[in-house]
């Protein structure tokens, strides 16, 4: 085909010519990510290699089934890729079994529950209002509709999970599955204690490590794998990979978990995403990745310390549990004149993206909330070091301490300098996706 014919053929037209509206929105999102500071705890930036894998010709390939047992021909190359992803996941986390096909963390969690319980069985997880996840039993979620749900919570004084309460509820309710994991909780969980309680009541233990999997991979967070029957995770939070899920388990659950993913929850896997997972899991075994996770933790600790300073306290700002063990800080605004929505909007004005989040025993409605969930993974990926994290922590602390009286222009200028000092995706426009 001649160049002239290619220019008129939609198969060869670049995105900015064929669909300028979509191209402009993507360019706008790239500018937003570059020019602002991303501090939503569940977000991160994937490396060039992951963008290339996910934007590859693998998007064309259907591959229902598993390596060596596909329902379609032509799967030789995708079999290699899926085997790489499974082997890397098992090696990284010390697991006996891995399934890398789930399209998302929620899909992975649905498959886990399909494996460990029957509809109508009782499951027990951390209350959504106290930091749990939708898929751990929220009444409007599939997990709340298909299963009988009981919840444990945090102690009203310490704001930490009380293992005595967990045991008391488990003994009374006799759940089929106990879930350890969270979406907004700043401390380690005691996986050994959860295992002991599960064994005592004859329950299966499932740990959802979506938020802290990267820390586990780096050896900077206790691993749930030795204590759990099944572990699930997303790949895009602290692991810093594509938006997708994985499942790890003891070998005895392999056959049922595979069946629960396909055909139980999904048809064909997204092989471009599986390739991106494989690449992300390779990166997660490097020393550079471990350094990034260490800076993630240090950044969160610096932020927690700044938000407990005298000016923040005077403005009614507090930090849930008084600090953090992980990649996020939960700012408690119950005694502040600002609610979570107002605080989120204020930080958005200065160029920092966070999300409002309910705190335990929150008196405000869930769309308003009395808290902020602030995370450091994306900034660590961007290259932030201790001085940079100290600066962004001070920007946030100053903004929350001053509220509507904050000097927005001054704070925005400080954010802009940090964004310029730690550039993101340099040369992206020139990268070739193959």
Swiss-Prot record:
Database matches in InterPro entries: PyrdxlP-dep_Trfase, PyrdxlP-dep_Trfase_major, PyrdxlP-dep_Trfase_small, Ser_HO-MeTrfase, Ser_HO-MeTrfase-like, Ser_HO-MeTrfase_PLP_BS, SHMT-like_dom
Protein name: Serine hydroxymethyltransferase
Transmembrane parts of this sequence: none
Complex formation: Homodimer.
Location of the protein in the cell: Cytoplasm
HAMAP family: SHMT
A GO CC term assigned to this protein in UniProt: cytosol
Transport listed as a keyword: no
PANTHER family, per the entry: SERINE HYDROXYMETHYLTRANSFERASE, SERINE HYDROXYMETHYLTRANSFERASE 1
List of residues binding (6S)-5,6,7,8-tetrahydrofolate: 128, 132-134
Site (Plays an important role in substrate specificity): 236
Function noted in UniProt: Catalyzes the reversible interconversion of serine and glycine with tetrahydrofolate (THF) serving as the one-carbon carrier. This reaction serves as the major source of one-carbon groups required for the biosynthesis of purines, thymidylate, methionine, and other important biomolecules. Also exhibits THF-independent aldolase activity toward beta-hydroxyamino acids, producing glycine and aldehydes, via a retro-aldol mechanism.
Family per similarity comment: Belongs to the SHMT family.
Gene behind the chain: glyA
GO biological process terms held by the UniProt record: glycine biosynthetic process from serine; tetrahydrofolate interconversion
Keyword Cytoplasm: yes
Annotated keywords: Amino-acid biosynthesis, Cytoplasm, One-carbon metabolism, Pyridoxal phosphate, Transferase
Disulfide bonds: none
GO molecular function: glycine hydroxymethyltransferase activity; pyridoxal phosphate binding
Primary location class: cytoplasm
């Amino acid at each position: 085909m001649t160049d002239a014919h290619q220019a008129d053929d939609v198969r060869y037209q670049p995105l900015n010519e064929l669909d300028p509206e979509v191209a402009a929105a993507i360019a706008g999102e790239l500018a937003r990510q570059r020019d602002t500071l991303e501090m939503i705890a569940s977000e991160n930036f994937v490396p060039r290699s992951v963008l290339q894998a996910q934007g590859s010709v693998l998007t064309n390939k259907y591959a229902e089934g598993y390596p060596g047992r596909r329902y379609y021909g032509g799967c030789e190359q995708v079999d290699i890729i899926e085997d790489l992803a499974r082997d890397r996941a098992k090696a990284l986390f010390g697991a006996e079994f891995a399934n890398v096909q789930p399209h998302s963390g929620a899909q992975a969690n649905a498959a886990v529950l399909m494996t460990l319980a029957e509809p109508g069985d009782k499951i027990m997880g951390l209350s959504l209002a106290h930091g749990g996840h939708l898929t751990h039993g929220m009444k409007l979620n599939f997990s709340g509709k298909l299963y009988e749900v009981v919840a444990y919570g945090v102690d009203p004084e310490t704001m930490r999970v009380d293992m005595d309460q967990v045991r008391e509820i488990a003994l009374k309710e006799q759940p089929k599955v106990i879930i350890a994991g969270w979406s907004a909780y700043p401390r380690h969980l005691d996986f050994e204690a959860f295992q002991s309680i599960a064994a005592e009541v004859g329950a299966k233990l499932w740990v959802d490590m979506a938020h802290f999997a990267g820390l586990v991979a780096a050896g900077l967070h206790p691993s749930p794998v030795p204590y759990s029957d099944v572990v699930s995770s997303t790949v895009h939070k602290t692991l810093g990979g594509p938006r997708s899920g994985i499942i790890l388990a003891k070998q005895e659950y392999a056959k049922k978990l595979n069946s629960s993913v396909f055909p139980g929850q999904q048809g064909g896997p997204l092989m471009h995403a599986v390739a991106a997972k494989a690449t992300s899991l390779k990166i997660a075994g490097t020393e550079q990745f471990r350094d990034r996770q260490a800076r993630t933790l240090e950044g969160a600790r610096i932020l927690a310390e700044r938000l407990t300073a005298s000016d923040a306290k005077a403005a009614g700002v507090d930090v849930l549990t008084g600090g953090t063990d992980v990649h996020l800080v939960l700012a408690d605004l119950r005694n502040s004149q600002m609610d979570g929505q107002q605080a989120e909007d204020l930080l958005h004005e200065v160029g920092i993206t966070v999300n409002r989040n309910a705190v335990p025993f929150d008196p405000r409605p869930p769309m308003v909330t009395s808290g902020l969930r602030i995370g450091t993974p994306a900034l660590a990926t961007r290259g932030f070091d201790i001085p940079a994290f100290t600066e962004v922590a001070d920007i946030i602390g100053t903004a929350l301490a001053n509220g509507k009286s904050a000097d927005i222009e001054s704070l925005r200028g400080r954010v802009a300098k940090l964004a310029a000092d730690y550039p993101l995706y340099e040369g992206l426009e020139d990268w070739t996706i193959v």
